[in-house]
Amino acid sequence: MKKDIVKPSILPGFMELLPADQIVFNKMKDTIRHNYEKFGFIPLDTPTIEKSEILLAKGGGETEKQIYRFNKGNTDLSLRFDLTVPLARYVSQHFSDLNFPFRRYHISKVFRGERNQKGRFREFYQCDIDIIGNGSLSIINDAEIPSIIYQTFKELGFEDFTIRINNRKVLNGFFEGTDVEDRKGVLRAIDKIEKIGEDGVRKELQELGLEDSKIDKIINFINIKGTKSEVIKSLKELDIENDVFKEGVYELEKVVHYIKSFNVPDKNYKIDLTIARGLDYYTGTVYETVLNNYPQIGSVCSGGRYDNLAEHYTNQKLPGVGISIGLTRLFYQLREAKIIGENASSTLSQALVIPVGDTMEYSIKVANKLRENEIISELYLEDAKIGKKFAYADKLKIPYVILIGEDELKEEKVSVKNMETGNQESMSLEEAIKIIKNA
């Protein structure tokens, strides 16, 4: 009797990769982690499941619609939707055990109940860093963040990218001086300028009820461009008598000055007054990073300064600054643009050891020796024709095949074939190790 077969499938919006893509993805993740650690950030992992009251402490609304929520017994539980709220809970809970400023990185999956559409994921990796202060946090931390972004994306293989920097106090102070009431609405409209253009922003501002004279002032303001020093000079010349605005300009000038000290090339960062970052909790410096040759990808790394990370969990004032790389989205978009993944290998193996005839024990010794020398190696153990064994290596793009036949066994040598050039020669195992390690 034929048994029922369940059709193998996964839910839309969840991530699953074939080996070649998974290897590329993991290398990107390792590169990001390496750079975060290079700047002294320590690893943190928190539970995937949190109490719903923790995740919803700020209030429901859009967050409540997006989280995966369920009950286990009498406990109301949810899957985390970002890494920032768990950080706030963690720092509040373990406050007395932590050293401040607390520098942590967290690379892990988060979950959101997004609508199923292209470019939207329900399960995805975020790669976050944050520097949390106790009571206060030097503004120079805000200047160090772009150097971390720069080093990370450079090591990921990018040269032509721009870190766009602004300060929310500059925007808020300007709006106060312009007598704009719905500042959140205006910030959200400005934040969409990349997607909807200047005319779209103008239309949204009209829908918010702003008169044309105020809209013109806002549009003229966000269009202030030039070198970093020219933009700062233009902001000062606006002569806005507002303390918040003045503080924002001062902070922006200081951050830009110190970014240079952190050896970030001038071409890789600029002041952009359209950068608002839609999230309400940003209170100072804000960042967005774009790959200049691939504007359709949008921001690949963003973040900013916030005054009070954990106000819903503690009375301690915990200011911070941080960024997040949405790795899953970045990976898929880079792959779609054919920037990564072309001709990627489906294995990590550097060598495939193939026993021919009665040479299994010597072949095992050879594989052991390769691994002792940090060469990732496979041993082909299946009974198959030699052509099939070579086809296996070729399909996986294993660069070297080591053949062990009766002659190699007698002479205690190995026969090494370079799969790219087709060259094959007999040599000592020590020579083979040297060649493979130097390849």
Swiss-Prot record:
It catalyses: tRNA(His) + L-histidine + ATP = L-histidyl-tRNA(His) + AMP + diphosphate + H(+). PROSITE patterns: AA_TRNA_LIGASE_II. GO terms for biological process: histidyl-tRNA aminoacylation. It is an enzyme of class 6 (ligase). The keyword Aminoacyl-tRNA synthetase applies. One of its GO terms (cellular component) is cytoplasm. It is found in: Cytoplasm. CDD domains: HisRS-like_core, HisRS_anticodon. The keyword ATP-binding applies. Its EC number is 6.1.1.21. It comes from the Bacteria. Gene3D superfamilies: Anticodon-binding domain, Bira Bifunctional Protein, Domain 2. Keywords: Aminoacyl-tRNA synthetase, ATP-binding, Cytoplasm, Ligase, Nucleotide-binding, Protein biosynthesis. GO terms for molecular function: ATP binding; catalytic activity, acting on a protein; histidine-tRNA ligase activity; transferase activity. Belongs to the class-II aminoacyl-tRNA synthetase family. Homodimer. This is Histidine--tRNA ligase. It comes from Clostridium tetani (strain Massachusetts / E88). The lineage of its organism: Bacteria, Bacillati, Bacillota, Clostridia, Eubacteriales.
